[in-house]
């Protein structure tokens, strides 16, 4: 891109979708997926890192440009003793279809030194540029989906033709909360995480509050969801409660009620779908906590709890699914817009046989596609809780 034919467009909230809050930094803007108030109440580095990773966040604009450059400062996560992951992927969509991809090398590196405590150290690095060249000529709608597993500070947007703000979307907004699977763990690129694929199939705008390791019924997350505008809401509950061994059944049931009560304060009649965990054999009937298993040179997870303690209130996915079904049935008596979906209908025994979980917990790219297909059919399809109402 020559300097004689270059436009630099300020990156503002008008160009971003999927972000809950934007933090002004010395370089530019840092998208967040929790409000500033909620972030002040985060108790650990795991969620602080996860909510700042822009899963589902994208720049959206119209342009005739054939070359687009986005300067960013990524913060990448690596685990001590393991090879660093590949650089995060930026997906560029034209008129809703994936047209190009890029990555940014360098950046900050946060090294997790203890997988149990998530203790980490940060090494600072340089900013870089995601460059998309040889794009089709002519006016087009462009989306740049940011890497879902890299904190991404936005610095500058350059093009070889002017950029116009896209008109406000007329599509419904879907607000979703879940665990690392909803965050996009093990998906190959950001527009291929299951919530993004399901949103595309359902024709809705996604706000993704999938937080790796952190779907723990935190009240500050419920308050954030209460205050975020949405036409459709889903909450996926179970796997993090079990794999962190965060609570017992006595605490779990009122925590779910409280979480749903808080959401309903801001969205009293919005379709609200409670989704339980997908099939995860290591946690179906064995309590947590989950522990990393490094035997064989690759990361897998194993449950370390004692199944005999289920009678004392230790939680498993089977117990949580049963309890969630009861909670929703009870509440639906006076909340007709509350619905329940068993996560095994998204990914169950037959899906596991076809697309096993590589690390025993997280689906791969094919698994994400299967979950998205089933969610789109069951939630957005005819008769589903998110189906478009016809008059």
Annotated model-derived regions:
Residues 1-173, 294, 380-391:
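N-terminal secretory targeting modules
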Residues 135, 142-229:
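Serine-esterase "nucleophile elbow" of acetyl-processing enzymes
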Residues 194, 252-259, 320-327:
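A general structural detector for well-ordered alpha-helical segments in enzyme core domains, enriched
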Residues 198, 217-265, 269, 277-287, ...:
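Oxyanion-hole/transition-state-stabilizing segment in secreted/luminal serine hydrolases
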Residues 203-205, 229-232, 267-272, 335-338:
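Loop/turn elements at helix/coil->beta-strand transitions in domains of secreted/extracellular proteins
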Residues 208-215, 243, 360-363:
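Acidic/histidine-rich helix-loop elements
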Residues 281-391:
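Catalytic His-Asp segment of secreted/periplasmic serine-dependent ester chemistry enzymes
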């Amino acid at each position: 891109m020559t300097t004689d034919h270059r436009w630099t467009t300020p990156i503002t909230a008008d160009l971003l979708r999927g972000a809950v809050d934007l933090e002004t930094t010395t370089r530019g803007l840092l998208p967040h997926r929790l409000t500033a108030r909620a972030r002040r109440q985060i108790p650990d580095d795991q969620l602080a890192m996860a909510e700042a990773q822009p899963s589902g966040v994208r720049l959206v604009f119209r342009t005739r440009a054939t070359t687009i450059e986005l300067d960013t400062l990524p913060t990448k996560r690596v685990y001590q003793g393991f090879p660093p992951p590949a650089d995060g992927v930026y997906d560029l969509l034209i008129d809703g279809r994936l047209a190009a991809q890029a990555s940014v090398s360098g950046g900050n590196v946060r090294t997790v030194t203890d997988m149990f405590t998530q203790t980490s150290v940060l090494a600072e690095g340089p900013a870089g540029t995601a460059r998309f060249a040889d794009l089709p000529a002519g006016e087009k709608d462009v989306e740049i989906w940011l890497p879902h597993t890299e904190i991404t500070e936005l610095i500058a947007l350059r093009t070889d033709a002017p950029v116009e703000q896209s008109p406000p979307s007329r599509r419904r907004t879907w607000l979703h909360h879940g665990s690392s699977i909803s965050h996009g763990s093990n998906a190959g690129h950001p527009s291929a995480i299951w919530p993004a694929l399901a949103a595309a199939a359902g024709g809705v705008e996604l706000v993704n509050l999938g937080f790796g390791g952190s779907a723990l019924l935190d009240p500050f997350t419920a308050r954030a969801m209460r205050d975020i505008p949405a036409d459709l809401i889903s909450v996926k509950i179970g796997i993090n409660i079990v794999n962190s061994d965060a609570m017992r059944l006595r605490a779990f049931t009122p925590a779910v009620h409280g979480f749903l009560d808080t959401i309903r304060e801001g969205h009293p009649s919005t379709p609200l779908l409670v989704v339980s965990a997908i099939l995860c054999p290591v946690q179906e009937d064995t309590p947590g906590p989950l522990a990393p298993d490094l035997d064989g040179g690759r990361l897998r997870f194993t449950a370390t709890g004692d199944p005999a303690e289920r009678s004392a209130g230790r939680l498993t996915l089977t117990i949580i699914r049963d309890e969630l079904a009861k909670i929703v049935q009870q509440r639906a008596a006076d909340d007709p817009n509350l619905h329940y979906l068993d996560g095994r209908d998204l990914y169950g025994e037959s899906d596991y046989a076809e697309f096993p979980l590589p690390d025993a917990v997280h689906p791969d790219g094919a698994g994400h596609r299967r979950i998205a297909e089933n969610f789109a059919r069951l939630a957005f399809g005819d008769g589903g809780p998110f189906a478009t109402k016809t008059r």
